[in-house]
Amino acid sequence: MSDFQHAQLDWDENGQPLSRVFGDVYFSRHSGLDETRHVFLATNRLAERFAALGDGEALCIGETGFGTGLNFLCAWQLFERVAPPGARLEFVSVEKFPLAAADLRRALALWPELAPWSEPLLGQYLALHPGFQRLAFAGGRVGLTLLLGDALECLPQLDARIDAWFLDGFAPAKNPDMWSPALFAELARLSAPQATLGTFTSAGFVRRGLIEAGFAMQRVPGYGQKREMLGGTYQGPPASAGKPWYARPAPHAGRRAALVVGGGLAGCASAASLAARGWQVTLIERHPGLAREASGNPQGVLYLKLSAHGTPLSRLVLSGFGHTRRLLERLRRGHDWDACGVLQLAFDAKEAQRQAQLAAAFPADLLHGLDREQAERLAGVALPAGGLFYPEAGWVHPPALCQALATTPGITLLSGRAVRLRREGDDWCAYAGDECLARAPLAILATAADIRDFPPAAELPLKRIRGQVTRLPATAQSRALRTVVCAEGYVAPPRGDEHTLGASFDFKSEDLAPTLAEHQGNLELLREISPDLLQRLGADDLPLERLEGRAAFRCTSPDYLPLVGPLAERAAFDEAYAVLARDARQVPERACPWLPGLYLNSGHGSRGLISAPLSGELLAAWICGEPLPLPRAVGEACHPNRFLLRDLVRGQRG
């Protein structure tokens, strides 16, 4: 990923951008807006199709070449003008060389009439790094998934059904990779039946290639001085559904109502993602308020645990970080969160080697190495080593994020009641004793390891790990700390009048009462991070019994990935795919026996701030039949069925 770079631009005498790499314009020099509306909106009949959408229905547009975002903004503008209130727009666009934020602002300033749509885009145009990046607008009514990277690497990872295509790469003669048979085959794989397509080019090899891929193509009048362009409709066969145990359940039809059990980050994010799509959601929390367990710490860290090798976990973290970072813009900076950066110290030779590999694998605006002197200057305190700095990261007050998510219109909170779920007819019913508190056709379990208290999830291999944080009173001297610093533990700049220090790992204890021993252990973690900061805090002179803190249980899985997705009925699953116990290469043509309307969002470990909000979007995509906001392989790596499949192949049960 180290070759990831922003677009290199030149600007002509009219202030319009040109690609230095491809030597081509981003839009018509005469009227880019009118060209977009003719080539893409009119050719795909979007005004008619937007207007015909039903309540809760979405139209999905796919694009090759996001560029300045002009096509997206014009489509959004038209959608807002003609679509009924309950309809949604999903837009997926691939871009190898995204514009830097300053360049995007300069380009979009050419179109002041688009300001009501371009300003929200510019406000969300941050923390965009390689891979899948999810953005949301208009209260979640408009979704934008950017695939940042080479089209022939990104599109094969996409799981979507595209209703209309915008083919808008640079001219075929200047950028032939965007007009290749391999790319056309991906367009066909991703196309919904009768998907439409528009493109400015009329090149014969493009027309023939699209016909070969399954599109019925025709030349139609071009815009302005361009005599012809291409339009078409996909008439080829539908794509294979893949392995049935990871196939999508049928998109939910009928009453759009859901129960979400659990009022931490995973539950609040799941509820918010569905509510943003027009669902009525009952959020059920057994405690008197939200974020009373692992999501209740005063400060959590946006720490990116990445791999230089593109593992599913690393890709989840990279996409999840961007999504959370954009969500945080809604909160009060300095009180609810702060983008002060995170410094991971290179505390030994092995860690230094790992950091060097990461610095070579990722863009410098995501992370870069600092020597000791640079690190101390940035942190404001003396440190034992340099390290890796994440400039866009920082600390978050998790309860504030939970509260913000839970205030999404359409969410009703029921707190102070522990419930059990029972299926009655077409609904899941939440019972407290003999009283049914709420019912809905869909339910999401988001109670960390306690999802095992619900019989359908009882055998999932989740474990609890106790963690304790220590709160230290800030001093005039300790306020010099300007960034989160991590080694084996972490310490954050003060929120109000307190620093948060943590966190311990205890795999055995089931007691949530804070202990003096773990306060002492946290102080030792601080000593490793910065003896100077320890002294500034006067921590050695603080009586342990007077220290304050809290303990909670992290929930994690054997592979450290969360469990996000639909849940199958185990006995029926074992019966349907019994052949896998003898030959794991078999793919039986039997539909997965899903538990109707039951989904999970759990197992986020110590990464919940990064992974839980995007997992809410992943769940909503599974439920609503939308493009997955993550690569398909990452979605499968997080799928609850992976453990049923593993046990079946290994001949294990329970």
From Swiss-Prot:
Region spans: FAD-dependent cmnm(5)s(2)U34 oxidoreductase: 261-654
Record keywords: Cytoplasm, FAD, Flavoprotein, Methyltransferase, Multifunctional enzyme, Oxidoreductase, S-adenosyl-L-methionine, Transferase, tRNA processing
HAMAP family: MnmC (MF_01102)
Catalytic activity, as annotated: 5-aminomethyl-2-thiouridine(34) in tRNA + S-adenosyl-L-methionine = 5-methylaminomethyl-2-thiouridine(34) in tRNA + S-adenosyl-L-homocysteine + H(+)
Name used for this protein in its record: tRNA 5-methylaminomethyl-2-thiouridine biosynthesis bifunctional protein MnmC
Subcellular location: Cytoplasm
GO terms, biological process: methylation; tRNA wobble uridine modification
Cofactor: FAD
InterPro entries xrefs: FAD-dep_OxRdtase, FAD/NAD-bd_sf, MnmC-like_methylTransf, SAM-dependent_MTases_sf, tRNA_MAMT_biosynth_bifunc_MnmC, tRNA_MNMC2, tRNA_S-uridine_synth_MnmC_C
Biological function: Catalyzes the last two steps in the biosynthesis of 5-methylaminomethyl-2-thiouridine (mnm(5)s(2)U) at the wobble position (U34) in tRNA. Catalyzes the FAD-dependent demodification of cmnm(5)s(2)U34 to nm(5)s(2)U34, followed by the transfer of a methyl group from S-adenosyl-L-methionine to nm(5)s(2)U34, to form mnm(5)s(2)U34.
The protein's Enzyme Commission number: 2.1.1.61, 1.5.-.-
Record family assignment: In the N-terminal section; belongs to the methyltransferase superfamily. tRNA (mnm(5)s(2)U34)-methyltransferase family. In the C-terminal section; belongs to the DAO family.
UniProt GO MF annotations: flavin adenine dinucleotide binding; oxidoreductase activity, acting on the CH-NH group of donors; tRNA (5-methylaminomethyl-2-thiouridylate)(34)-methyltransferase activity
Top-level taxon: Bacteria
This protein's record includes keyword Isomerase: no
Gene expressing this chain: mnmC
Gene3D superfamilies (alphabetical): D-Amino Acid Oxidase, subunit A, domain 2, FAD/NAD(P)-binding domain, Vaccinia Virus protein VP39
Region (tRNA (mnm(5)s(2)U34)-methyltransferase) location: 1-235
GO cellular component terms, A-Z: cytoplasm
UniProt key word Ion transport: no
